[in-house]
């Protein structure tokens, strides 16, 4: 079942993943393949949502989507089935797939789609199914574990398996250990047994030796018995007999030796004698014989000598042996004699020997035991060394691992810090980039609004916002703010305040938009009122509480104070220790100081009685310390060092603890009583507080640490240098330490300096100079700069040295003590190193900035060098700093000495004389009168600063009567020109003083100058408390008013730009509004084109058409005129809007508000000066009932100002309205005049507004001048009252003048006389007793009064000058702004007029162009096919639109194939293929049936056109002959081969081309199925292609030439394809076997074999000659018998000859390894039709018999060649078999039949007879 399903899935459905029976459950466990199967049947529309994953979420998703579809198909599927499939339960997936297969087959048979199946369900069932699906999803979600749980289970299982393996390994190791132990135990037991056995054996040997050593002494009586005597005699006899026998044997042996020697000698003598005789006989015969005899004699003599030597040697050996035997006998006899001793001696000897043996054994045992002990000691020592080495190695490994872990942790922290810095930098850059983009878009927007001319003010404001990181675009509306504004609204408020402040600074400093014009630059007044600034500064000092004077030592100390900072382990302490050896410095370490303070508390260190005052000071300092701790304690600035804990002290806990220390009584265990605690030293008290904090597990706060440091510094002698070690470490500690050492706080100093400068409008130059900051607490700060890696490596080096030190041989107690002591320190160092480095990196930037400002005392040193070099560098720096401090102190001492000397010299000089008295009052009045007379001439407009000095000297003689005249003169003309045209020369105050009659006295200093001494008389205490808030109110109201007005002006600028852009764009849109001209043009064109063709040349018709064109032109011109009038009216409406007047009125009101603010400030300042100087003169200030002067605002017509009229006076605007002058006619001339009048009205209204601004400015200027004149008059009246002896003649004109100036002075005089009326009686009482002291006092008071008056009037006149200058500047800017606004608006109005005129002219021109085109077509009598488009000012001929269609184009007929030379067309070939395919689908048909079909097609050709004309004359014998050529095995015909032959001509392929085509097909057939589709067939192609050089005929009505070869390629696929499959499949190997046919039979077979094998098959040498002959004979046949066509015959002949020559050349050049390819039985049967053709018809038994014969022959051949199991055989071996050779030479299926012979013969016979049917003749003509 699984295999069937797998075949269904893999082959039929072709799923994305190959499924096998083994992996069936796993493949479907995710549900993805199930969704794919349903998707292929178009049932799963949401297959794209499926997830091809094995996670739980993917499975849940897939099965949730599968459940509705499976239930729709009727497959049983629930959560249990889904769970079984997911858990890969065997058989569940197979069962579901089988049910699904059955359901899908049913669905396929029914032909219903998924949508149709869903619609066929009932609604209730559908709802129920949806509920089931939801329930299914919920239950499945609970059943399937989450992926995290699954992963956890998998990890747990994996670790359980690992635990099992580890446990098994441990058990195995334990078992091996037990076995090893048992084996060792057994070996030990065997060794003990062997040892015991050896000991027992040794003991037995010793006992045996002892037993053998015991001599058994026989009894004495036994030697004397008869038997013993006889035995002794017998023994003696026997011995003697044996001796005799031995002697006899020896003697006989000697005799035998002698006899043998004699016999040998006799033999040799005989031989020599015989030889000599023979030699003598032959002596005379030959000399050689003699030589031989002589030689033999010599050899015999030599042999005798050798024998004698041997005999002698033998005798000597015997003699020596005999002597040795005798010697042994003698020794034996001697031993026997020696052994004949007593039994006691022998026993003693045996015992001694035994004792000696025992001693030797004991000695050996002791040596063995000592050796064992030595080995054991060596082994123990070596074990200890190995154990220590292993421990050291393990410690080293642990240390390296810890180092790597810390390094990774540090790298991770560094990466996080770098990432944080990067993110911060990235966010800043992104914010800046966003602001740049906003600025760019804002600029682009306003370039569009302002026509690329952005105002400077706008660009300046945008840049300010950009530089201050404020958003340029509006974030939220701030018009109505809620109670809790949002963040965006707060940002908008900040933006507004920033721009307001910038505008105010520009206004105040007269820069930017408020820069002075060229005509006002020369008359610029002083920027500051020094007198007013001095007054305000004095009042502010009076209002502030008195300061505590700072106590500074008179003589500075030469001691140097510094600190050495750096990271942990940067070498601070080491460097300071080395410095302490060379310099007398005191090193202060916070760790040591804290420990000493705690130790002092434990030691009860008490204050000595010499300083009893210190107790009270400490008691007072405790609450102060408590408050400081509460204020400065911050969790972020808590430092811990050494024993101090790293935890941060919370603020509340710290406060509670410190308050408890200050208020509550300590416990009895810690401090016995409060008195005893207060008797402790400061260090002990600080140590007590530190210990309390540390016991609670808290950190010591910075305040306590700083107190400990300061206490230690105070205990150091004054002239001794001190350096802090690693302190301070945070900015808070540095601030607290500097404040404790210097008594100054930088932040508080800045705040106090800002508070002291109360005023921004008036500054006291004497106090505005910057106060130098106090010198820092340290003279230098040295930073030892090391990297984090160096710090950590140093820590590791220290720990490594300690580890190596531990491994050295030490005393055990010392080692344990060192280990316990260093372990905590190392652990603390290792634990805190990362936090310390991070803390230093976090705090150092702030500390670096602190030590670099205001005086840079920071010195950085690279500490990553050796110790000696670093010490030298620090020594050089310390030496330099000591020298600097010494020079600095000496310089200070020299400065103090110089100051003392200067003070002493000044004290010795006489006091300077007081300044001379002022001139008498009448002279002053004359001067004032003269100067005022000179000012009666009119002044030019725009020069108010020239009038200000005259205001100072104006006398009271020109009173009320001349007010109007002066006002008229000051107003001048509206254009600013004077009436006389001349500017009189005016005198300044300096000039008036120069005219003084006293010329001898030097010129006194002017009030407000640097030489002027201000009046510092005491003022009432209540006055500063009132005047300081009053001035703050003045200043704040002035600044707020200015900011508000400037803000409105800024906002109005945006409004103006937006409005001007809006009216420009709206007017342009109005000009572009649609018109109806195109409708008239289209109607005219339709009428024009609808004219009949016969009327085009008629003159009357043309005249009528011209008239119609004129009518159309007039109508279009009327439309243009109407549009022009509407546009002019629209422009006039825009001009007549009240926007410009309202905007001008609002702008003037804003500038009038600025004037009002300046006027208010002047009035308030005048009142403040008056109150101040009156208070200094001890006068009672008079209440000013007069209301402040108000500048009227412009009344706007569009607003209701009834309410505001009660507060601010309004003046009406005089504007010229166009509606009051002209009515509203609609003619063009009236509109033109109306527009001109509108522009003139705009200009005239602007002149009226300009005059109104000038009048307002003159009114404000006059008000200021009158107030100053009134103040001067009041001062003169007071002086007249006080100077009683003055001349009454001089007073009368002054009184007359006062009446003319104002109406109110009489009332004031009455009020002033009331308080001053009491003074004359006092003056009258004193003249009787007048002393010199009183005269001097009166004189001093008069001088003081004159000085006060001068100072008061100078301050007031300065304010007048500044106010007049400000008012004129406001007037100038107002006129310039109004003029600029009117110019912009008028330019826009003129631009609108320009646009209107240009558009009207363009519309008229386009109408003229249309008229010209129409007249041209009328004259040429042609229709206008393309649309004429006229819209607004555009006219063109639209080539994309035609008003009537074009005539249809001529269509080229399709190509038609013609009959040529009896060749069948493609259509005829397809017709024959269809008929043959219906009768014989397999390609084989019987001979008779084939002949009958051809006869029927030829004879019964009733218009079917199945064959060409020359085929129609074939007779039955000729058709039978044709059949015989195609016959296979004498009974069958292959109709495919017939169609292949009849489709000629086509290029006959060479063998190489066939093989190349085969490789192409195999390359396309990726699955190597042997079949391809039509697309793959066309992609691969054949050895020939279609005709590419087809000529396209020029005549479009002529058809294209027919491409026969292209259609032949498609026909070959249809011919050989199997259409029973869908899509049709082509067996390309079978097709190429057909194309392998050749005129030569043998050649065709070899070509077929090459195609079947896939490579070239070489022919055998024997078969090459006959095949060549056959080829030549067959090649010659067509050339002779085919006279027509000659070209085709010649081409085919050449091709066949070339093929034959190549074959012969290949056969001649057969390589050695040719035909090594193997051929199987199936391939052989395919080549020789061994199993495919018998399937066509089963009724032909003979055919089956033949096929069976081939198969049996092939089997026998394979068996003969050694292939028992029919395995493939090499082609070379196969071709050598006779059966194969015979079959190749006789097989004729691969021979090309030549049917052209029959056709040519038929034509020849028909031509000779001359018989042709008329129908055929006509067909041939066609």
Swiss-Prot record:
Skewed-composition ranges (Low complexity): 975-987
Domain of life: Eukaryota
Annotated keywords: Cell projection, Cilium, Coiled coil, Cytoplasm, Differentiation, Disease variant, Flagellum, Golgi apparatus, Spermatogenesis
Coiled coil: 227-260, 321-396, 732-758, 871-909, 1686-1712
Entry keyword Isomerase: no
Any GO BP: epithelial cilium movement involved in extracellular fluid movement
Biased composition (Pro residues): 911-920
Ranges for region Interaction with IFT20: 1324-1676
Broad class of the protein's primary localization: other
CC per GO annotation: cilium; cytoplasm; cytosol; extracellular region; Golgi apparatus; manchette; nuclear body; sperm flagellum
Extent of Basic and acidic residues compositional bias: 921-930, 949-968, 1278-1292, 1303-1314, 1688-1708
Cellular location(s): Cell projection, Cilium, Flagellum; Cytoplasm; Golgi apparatus
UniProt domain Calponin-homology (CH): residue ranges: 1-105
Key word Cytoplasm present: yes
Record region (Disordered): 896-1004, 1278-1327, 1664-1718, 1803-1822
Pfam families: ADK, CH_2, SPEF2_C, SPEF2_D5
Disease in which the protein is involved: Spermatogenic failure 43: An autosomal recessive infertility disorder characterized by asthenospermia due to multiple morphologic abnormalities of sperm flagella, including short, absent, coiled, and bent flagella.
Assembly behavior: Interacts (via C-terminus) with IFT20. Interacts with DYNC1I2.
PANTHER family documented for this protein: KPL2-RELATED, SPERM FLAGELLAR PROTEIN 2
Function: Required for correct axoneme development in spermatozoa. Important for normal development of the manchette and sperm head morphology. Essential for male fertility. Plays a role in localization of the intraflagellar transport protein IFT20 to the manchette, suggesting function as an adapter for dynein-mediated protein transport during spermatogenesis. Also plays a role in bone growth where it seems to be required for normal osteoblast differentiation.
Protein name: Sperm flagellar protein 2
């Amino acid at each position: 079942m699984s295999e069937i399903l797998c075949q269904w899935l893999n082959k039929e459905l072709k799923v994305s993943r190959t499924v096998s029976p083994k992996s069936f459950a796993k493949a479907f466990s995710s549900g993805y393949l199930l969704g794919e199967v349903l998707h292929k049947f178009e049932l799963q529309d949401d297959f794209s949502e499926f997830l091809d994953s094995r996670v739980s979420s993917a499975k849940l998703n897939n099965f949730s989507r599968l459940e509705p579809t499976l239930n729709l198909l009727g497959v049983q599927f629930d959560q249990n089935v889904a769970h079984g499939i997911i858990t890969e339960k065997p058989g569940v997936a197979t069962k579901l797939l089988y049910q699904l297969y059955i359901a899908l087959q049913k669905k396929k048979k029914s032909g219903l789609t998924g949508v149709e199946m869903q619609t066929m369900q009932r609604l209730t069932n559908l709802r129920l199914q949806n509920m089931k699906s939801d329930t299914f999803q919920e239950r499945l979600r609970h059943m399937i574990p989450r992926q995290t749980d699954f992963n956890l289970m998998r990890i747990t299982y994996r670790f359980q398996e690992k635990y099992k393996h580890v446990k098994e390994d441990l058990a195995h190791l334990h078992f091996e250990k037990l076995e090893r132990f048992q084996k060792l135990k057994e070996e030990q037991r065997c060794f003990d047994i062997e040892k015991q056995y050896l000991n027992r054996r040794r003991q037995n040997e010793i006992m045996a030796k002892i037993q053998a050593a015991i001599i058994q002494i026989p009894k004495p009586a036994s030697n004397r018995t008869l038997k013993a005597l006889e035995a002794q005699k017998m023994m003696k006899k026997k011995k003697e007999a044996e001796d005799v026998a031995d002697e006899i044997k020896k003697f006989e042996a000697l005799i035998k030796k002698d006899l043998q020697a004699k016999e040998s000698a006799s033999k040799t003598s005989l031989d020599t004698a015989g030889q000599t005789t023979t030699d003598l006989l032959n002596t005379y015969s030959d000399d050689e014989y003699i030589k031989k005899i002589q030689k033999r004699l010599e050899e015999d003599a030599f042999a005798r000598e050798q024998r004698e030597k041997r005999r002698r040697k033998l005798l000597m050996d015997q003699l020596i042996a005999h002597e040795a035997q005798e010697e042994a006998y003698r020794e034996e006899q001697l031993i026997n004699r020696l052994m004949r001793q007593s039994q006691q001696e022998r026993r003693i000897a045996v015992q001694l020997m035994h004792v000696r043996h025992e001693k030797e054994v004991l000695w050996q045992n002791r040596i063995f035991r000592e050796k064992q002990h030595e080995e054991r000691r060596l082994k123990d020592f070596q074990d200890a060394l190995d154990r220590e080495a292993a421990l050291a190695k393990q410690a080293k490994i642990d240390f390296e691992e810890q180092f790597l872990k810390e390094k990774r942790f540090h790298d991770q922290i560094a990466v996080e810090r770098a990432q944080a810095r990067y993110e911060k930098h990235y966010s800043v850059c992104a914010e800046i980039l966003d602001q740049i983009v906003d600025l760019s878009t804002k600029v682009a927007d306003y370039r569009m609004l302002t026509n690329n001319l952005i105002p400077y003010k706008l660009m300046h404001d945008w840049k300010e916002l950009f530089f201050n990181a404020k958003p340029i675009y509006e974030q939220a509306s701030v018009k109505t703010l809620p109670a809790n504004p949002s963040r965006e609204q707060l940002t908008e408020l900040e933006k507004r305040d920033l721009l307001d402040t910038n505008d105010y600074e520009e206004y105040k400093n007269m820069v930017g938009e408020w820069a002075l014009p060229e005509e006002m630059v020369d008359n610029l007044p002083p920027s500051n009122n020094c007198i007013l600034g001095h007054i305000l500064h004095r009042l502010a000092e009076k209002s502030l509480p008195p300061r505590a004077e700072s106590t500074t030592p008179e003589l500075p100390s030469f001691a140097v104070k510094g600190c050495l900072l750096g990271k942990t382990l940067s070498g601070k302490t080491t460097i300071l220790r080395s410095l302490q050896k060379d310099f007398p410095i005191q090193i202060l370490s916070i760790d040591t100081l804290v420990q000493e303070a705690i130790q002092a508390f434990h030691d009860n260190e008490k204050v000595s009685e010499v300083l009893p005052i210190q107790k009270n000071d400490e008691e007072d300092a405790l609450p102060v310390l408590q408050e400081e701790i509460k204020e400065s304690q911050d969790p972020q600035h808590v430092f811990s060092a050494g024993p101090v804990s790293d935890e941060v002290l919370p603020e509340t806990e710290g406060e509670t603890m410190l308050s408890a220390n200050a208020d509550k009584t300590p416990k009895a265990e810690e401090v016995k009583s409060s008195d005893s605690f207060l008797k402790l030293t400061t260090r002990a008290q600080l140590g007590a507080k530190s210990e309390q904090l540390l016991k609670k597990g808290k950190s010591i706060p910075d305040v306590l640490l700083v107190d400990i440091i300061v206490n230690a510094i105070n205990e150091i002698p004054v002239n001794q240098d001190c350096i802090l070690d690693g302190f301070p470490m945070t900015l808070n500690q540095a601030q607290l330490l500097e404040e404790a050492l210097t008594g100054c706080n930088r932040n508080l100093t800045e705040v106090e300096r800002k508070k002291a400068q109360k005023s921004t409008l008036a500054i006291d130059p004497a106090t505005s100079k910057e106060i130098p900051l106090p010198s820092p607490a340290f003279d230098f700060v040295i930073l030892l700069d090391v990297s984090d890696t160096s710090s950590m490596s140093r820590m590791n080096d220290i720990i490594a040295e300690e580890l190596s030190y531990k491994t050295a041989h030490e005393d055990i107690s010392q080692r344990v003590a060192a280990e316990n002591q260093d372990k905590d320190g190392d652990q603390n160092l290792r634990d805190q190193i990362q936090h310390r480095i991070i803390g230093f990196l976090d705090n150092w930037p702030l500390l670096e900035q602190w030590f670099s400002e205001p005086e840079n005392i920071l010195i950085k040193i690279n500490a990553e060098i050796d110790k000696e070099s670093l010490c030298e560098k620090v020594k050089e720096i310390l030496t330099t700093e000591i020298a600097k401090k010494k020079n600095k102190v000496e310089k200070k001492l020299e400065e103090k000495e110089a100051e003392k000397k200067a003070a002493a010299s000044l004290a010795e000089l006489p006091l300077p004389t007081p300044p001379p008295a002022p001139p008498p009052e009448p002279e002053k009045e004359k001067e004032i009168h003269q100067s005022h007379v000179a000012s009666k001439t009119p002044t030019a407009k725009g020069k108010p600063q020239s009038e200000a000095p005259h205001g100072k000297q104006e006398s009271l003689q020109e009173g009320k009567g001349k007010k109007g005249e002066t006002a008229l003169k000051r107003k001048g003309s509206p254009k600013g020109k004077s009436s006389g045209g001349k500017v009189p020369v005016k005198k300044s105050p300096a000039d008036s003083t120069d005219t003084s009659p006293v010329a001898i006295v030097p010129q006194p200093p002017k009030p407000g100058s640097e030489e002027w001494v201000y009046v510092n008389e005491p003022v009432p205490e209540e006055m500063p408390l009132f005047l300081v808030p009053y001035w703050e109110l003045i200043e704040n109201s002035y600044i707020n008013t200015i900011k508000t007005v400037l803000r409105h002006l800024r906002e109005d600028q945006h409004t103006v730009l937006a409005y001007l852009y809006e009216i420009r764009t709206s007017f342009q849109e109005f000009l572009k509004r649609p018109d109806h001209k195109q409708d008239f043009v289209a109607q005219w064109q339709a009428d024009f084109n609808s004219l009949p063709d016969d009327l085009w040349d008629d003159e009357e018709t043309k005249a009528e058409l011209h008239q119609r064109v004129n009518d159309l032109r007039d109508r279009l011109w009327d439309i243009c005129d109407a549009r022009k009038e509407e546009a002019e009216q629209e422009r006039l409406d825009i001009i007549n809007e009240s926007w410009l007047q309202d905007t001008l009125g609002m702008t003037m009101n804003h500038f009038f508000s600025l004037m009002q603010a300046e006027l208010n400030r002047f009035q308030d300042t005048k009142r403040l000066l008056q109150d101040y100087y009156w208070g200094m003169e001890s006068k009672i200030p008079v209440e000013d009932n007069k209301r402040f002067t108000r500048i009227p605002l412009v009344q706007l017509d569009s607003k209701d100002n009834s309410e505001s009229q009660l507060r601010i006076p309004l003046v009406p605007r005089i504007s010229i309205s166009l509606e009051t002058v002209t009515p509203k006619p609609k003619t063009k001339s009236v509109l033109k005049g109306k527009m001109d009048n509108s522009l003139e009205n705009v200009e005239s209204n602007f002149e009226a507004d300009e005059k109104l601004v000038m009048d307002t400015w003159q009114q404000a200027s006059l008000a200021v001048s009158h107030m100053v004149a009134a103040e001067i008059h009041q001062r003169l009246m007071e002086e007249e009252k006080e100077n009683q002896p003055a001349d009454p003649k001089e007073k009368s004109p002054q009184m007359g003048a006062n009446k003319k100036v104002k109406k109110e002075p009489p009332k004031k005089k009455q009020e002033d006389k009331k308080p001053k009326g009491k003074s004359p009686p006092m003056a009258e009482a004193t003249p009787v007793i007048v002393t010199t002291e009183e005269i001097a006092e009166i004189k001093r008071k008069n001088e003081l009064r004159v000085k006060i008056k001068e100072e008061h009037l100078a301050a007031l006149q300065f304010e007048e000058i500044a106010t007049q200058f400000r008012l004129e500047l406001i007037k100038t800017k107002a006129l310039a702004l109004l003029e600029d606004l009117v110019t912009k608006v008028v330019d826009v109005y003129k631009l609108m007029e320009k646009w209107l005129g240009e558009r009207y002219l363009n519309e008229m021109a386009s109408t003229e162009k249309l008229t010209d085109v129409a007249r041209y077509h009328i004259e040429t009598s042609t229709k206008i096919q393309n649309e004429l488009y006229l819209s607004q000012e555009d006219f063109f001929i639209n080539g994309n639109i035609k008003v009537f269609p074009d005539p249809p184009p001529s269509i080229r007929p399709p190509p038609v194939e013609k009959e040529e030379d009896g060749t069948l067309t493609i259509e005829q070939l397809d017709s024959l293929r269809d008929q043959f395919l219906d009768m014989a689908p397999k390609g084989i048909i019987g001979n008779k049936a084939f002949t009958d079909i051809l006869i029927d097609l030829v004879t019964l050709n009733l218009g079917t056109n199945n064959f060409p004309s020359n085929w129609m004359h074939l007779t039955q014998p000729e058709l039978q002959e044709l059949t015989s050529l195609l016959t296979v095995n004498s009974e069958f015909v292959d109709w495919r081969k017939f169609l292949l032959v009849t489709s000629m001509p086509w290029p006959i392929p060479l063998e190489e081309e066939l093989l190349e085509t085969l490789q192409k097909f195999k390359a396309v057939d990726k699955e190597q199925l042997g079949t391809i589709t039509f697309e793959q067939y066309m992609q691969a192609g054949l050895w020939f292609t279609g005709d590419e050089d087809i000529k396209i005929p020029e005549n479009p009505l002529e058809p294209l030439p027919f491409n026969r070869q292209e259609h032949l390629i498609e026909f070959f696929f249809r011919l050989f394809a199997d259409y029973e499959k869908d899509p049709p499949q082509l067996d390309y190997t079978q097709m190429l076997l057909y194309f392998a046919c050749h005129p030569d039979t043998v050649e065709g077979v070899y070509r077929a074999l090459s195609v079947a094998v896939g490579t070239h098959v070489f022919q055998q040498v024997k078969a090459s000659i006959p095949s060549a002959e056959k080829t030549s004979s067959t090649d010659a046949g067509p050339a002779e018998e085919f006279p027509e066509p000659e070209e085709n015959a010649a081409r085919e002949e050449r091709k066949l000859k070339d093929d034959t020559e190549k074959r012969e050349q290949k056969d001649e050049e057969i390589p050695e390894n040719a035909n090594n390819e193997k051929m199987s039985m199936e391939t052989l049967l395919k080549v020789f039709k061994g199993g495919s053709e018998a399937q066509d018809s089963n009724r032909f038994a003979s055919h089956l018999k033949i096929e069976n014969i081939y198969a049996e022959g092939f089997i026998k051949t394979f068996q003969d060649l050694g292939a028992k199991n029919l395995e493939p055989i090499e082609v070379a071996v196969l071709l050598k078999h006779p059966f194969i050779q015979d079959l190749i030479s006789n097989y004729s299926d691969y021979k090309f039949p030549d049917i052209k012979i029959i056709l040519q013969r038929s034509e020849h016979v028909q031509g000779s007879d001359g018989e042709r049917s008329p129908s055929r003749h006509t067909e041939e003509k066609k």
